[in-house]
Regions:
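Short S/T/G/P-rich N-terminal loop/turn motif that feeds into the first structured element of a domain
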Residues: 1-35, 39-45, 53-57, 77-90
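A short local loop/turn or secondary-structure capping micro-motif enriched for an aromatic residue
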Residues: 13-14, 67-69
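Conserved short beta-strand edge segments in small beta-sheet-based binding/regulatory domains
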Residues: 68-79
Length: 90
């Protein structure tokens, strides 16, 4: 399953997040796959796409970062999957 993660850096400060990432890596458990991310120009927020079969892996990953960021999780699908899913209802 694909998830869009909205990651808001605590106090709008990305430095602690990037410092930990530099020193420890992504800290993702086995089975959670990072696909891509985009960061706002003011470094206040990051939008990531992650993939995993077990939502518990995503929760485990977020727990490792919750002291530095707040998370919103939105289950998403690719546009191709959306076309296939809605086609029978058109």
């Amino acid at each position: 399953m694909l998830y869009l993660i909205v990651e808001r850096f605590r106090d709008g400060d990305a430095r602690p997040v990037y410092r930990r990432f530099r020193d420890q890596g992504r800290l993702a458990p086995e089975g959670l796959r990072y696909l891509a991310s985009w960061v706002t120009q003011d470094f206040a927020c990051c939008y990531q796409v992650m993939e995993c079969e077990d939502r518990a892996l995503l929760e485990e990953w977020m727990a490792r970062w919750q002291d530095l960021a707040e998370f919103e999780v939105i289950p998403v699908m690719t546009s191709a999957d959306a076309v296939a899913a809605i086609a029978p209802r058109l």
